[in-house]
Swiss-Prot record:
Name the record gives this protein: Dehydrin Rab16B
Transmembrane intervals: none
Similarity comment: family membership: Belongs to the plant dehydrin family.
Comp. bias regions, Basic and acidic residues: 147-164
Species the sequence originates in: Oryza sativa subsp. indica (Rice)
Organism taxonomic ancestry: Eukaryota, Viridiplantae, Streptophyta, Embryophyta, Tracheophyta
Disulphide connectivity of cysteines: none
A Pfam family annotated for this UniProt entry: Dehydrin
Keywords in alphabetical order: Stress response
Compositional bias annotation for Low complexity: 107-117
Annotated spans, Disordered: 1-164
GO CC terms of this entry: cytosol
Induction (record text): By abscisic acid (ABA) and water stress.
Amino acid sequence: MENYQGQHGYGADRVDVYGNPVGAGQYGGGATAPGGGHGAMGMGGHAGAGAGGQFQPAREDRKTGGILHRSGSSSSSSSSEDDGMGGRRKKGIKEKIKEKLPGGNKGNNQQQQQMMGNTGGAYGQQGHAGMTGAGTGVHGAEYGNAGEKKGFMDKIKEKLPGQH
């Protein structure tokens, strides 16, 4: 029986044009087509429509030879950024989206990262180098009426308990 495998009418492993296994009960090689007609299928051919069957035209397979063709468009944002320690790290989806939003990225993120890397401060702390006087400096996120808008982090810090 082994010498008859691969020939028409014998139990060979059959695959469709995409390499998926095809059982004996599926369309092709002698099974009844949905319209009642019989499709004739030879080696490497396409099944035609029988009397009353549905006809599907042969598709040409387009192969690129293993080369990935890319479109000409590119994104202006890179997938990695400086981590402040001399290395690089991957950006998350949120960071990529924030970069693309208009007016949302004014360099605050890079300035904050540079300050963290240079001063060695903890995350979220801002440098208060000259404010050692007892009660005479600006305290925390309370800026007074200097005409400066509060930043996003300052608004969050205000709402946290025990940070005053």
